[in-house]
């Protein structure tokens, strides 16, 4: 046994889109890792790079700089010296930062935007795979402008996603980017 037994060996959390929530999640990660817990963090709610921040009237740096801190925290805390810290970051395929997220584990590029000790994974909706097979485009959104996508699946997701695409074309959604679905798929695999 251990002095601090846990009810679970792995903890899955969703990180909110505000600094208190983001750094609270990092603190929670450190404490859970201290007692040998593995971690999975859903970063989808955090606004994408370039998205407007109302409180400061500035622009977001996106999820990647925060993931670098999470990576380094896992290395520093290392599950109480028992084994290497285990953390995985998750992001949905429609998130504005997905392309940079897919680069996190590469050995080339700016090391300040790499997480060599963290695993990454992303959720892929059926609609994305349809777009890949049909050689169509895929639109990336910042979750602060597409708030409910993260909670939808199936036809509900498809209907809302396509509404957001129309709103983006009309100029009503500022933080978005259209990409080739097949090209994004190649980056994923």
Describe the function of each predicted region.
Residues 8-189:
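Active-site cavity-forming subdomains of large catalytic enzyme subunits
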């Amino acid at each position: 046994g251990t002095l601090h037994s846990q009810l679970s060996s792995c903890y899955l959390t969703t990180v909110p889109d505000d600094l208190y929530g983001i750094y609270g999640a990092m603190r929670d990660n450190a404490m859970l890792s201290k007692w040998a817990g593995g971690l999975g963090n859903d970063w989808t709610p955090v606004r994408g790079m370039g998205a407007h921040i109302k409180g400061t009237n500035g622009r977001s740096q996106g999820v990647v700089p925060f993931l670098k801190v999470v990576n380094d925290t896992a290395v520093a805390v290392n599950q109480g010296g028992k084994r290497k810290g285990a953390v995985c970051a998750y992001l949905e395929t429609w998130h504005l930062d997905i392309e940079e997220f897919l680069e996190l584990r590469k050995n080339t590029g700016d090391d300040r935007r790499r997480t060599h000790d963290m695993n990454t994974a992303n959720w892929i909706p059926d609609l994305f795979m349809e777009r890949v097979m049909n050689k169509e485009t895929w639109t990336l959104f910042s979750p602060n402008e597409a708030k409910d996508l993260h909670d939808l699946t199936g036809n509900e997701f498809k209907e809302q996603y396509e509404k957001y695409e129309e709103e983006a074309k009309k100029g009503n959604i500022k933080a978005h980017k259209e990409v080739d679905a097949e090209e994004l798929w190649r980056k994923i695999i």
